[in-house]
């Protein structure tokens, strides 16, 4: 979908704040399912313009755009690598919505594969270390000092609130998607989570979506994080939820396939079944390569960095997979309703969400140990 923006109006607005320039361009970035990003060139400077999506999988699942601006502003004087913010605009008449502009950082995001320069055991080891060390920095932020002490509203009930919110998201999506297939396994996961919410021992800043494809690694070697991106789900809460989310994406060779026999039997004739292998089997599979930390090693490093003990692993990783399933079911509803910013991958969610349900059950049943 092409985003229509009055570029002349935007140019005038920016000129008043950044100074006049003869060179100006605005292009849409691909990827992402939440806030939209556009590449902005202003003279010799390059920026990223962030704006809300035309439609969301469920508005209550994502925090406001200006919250993201607020946290990036607060983190500029910390050890957490983030893009510097430039300006925020609450005047919707400029581009048709609120927006903010931030520094555009260069490098590579690791999603389906790793760049050639990182394809050695030494660089892979650094990727794991950098990823965990940066997460530890996020969880060590003094929120009072940076002005974020009232950033979240869930209090000590963060985990219970997450389970309730995600279950509500799934139920909302199923109002439209239930006619396509049943998701009893996902609701069983929701019940298990509700019955097994642990007591949170720590309350810190949490990113909410911390994983490799939201981390920009700088160009060159050694592997080094240039910036942590996509803070729209950040809040104050249980830091172990961030770690569990990261671990749910970090695959190992011993992990069973989430494409179980019953999934294959039910969907093997589906037009999108070949794509399921890419998303369910190949996504982040490179973390199985020689040199990458195992999940247990990541946990050990995190515990040493933060002093937090990672307990209740099955709950936190299952919560991570369930969170992804609930969000993906929202994307599937968007596809069925032909929402304005529906992406090409959204039809696949018909198959992906039941598969995620099986993956969560594998964690609960101990088939995918830490």
Feature-to-residue mapping (PLM):
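Juxta-kinase regulatory segment immediately upstream of eukaryotic protein kinase catalytic domains
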Residues: 1-24
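ATP/Mg2+ or Mg2+-diphosphate-binding catalytic cores
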Residues: 2, 285-313, 324-370
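ATP-binding pocket architecture of kinase catalytic cores
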Residues: 27-204, 219-223
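Protein kinase-like catalytic domain
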Residues: 76, 139-142, 229, 247, ...
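Conserved catalytic-loop position in the HRD/HxD motif
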Residues: 209
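Activation of the activation-loop gatekeeper triad in protein kinase-fold domains
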Residues: 228-234
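Active-site activation/catalytic loop segments of kinase-like enzymes and analogous catalytic loops
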Residues: 241-306, 321-337
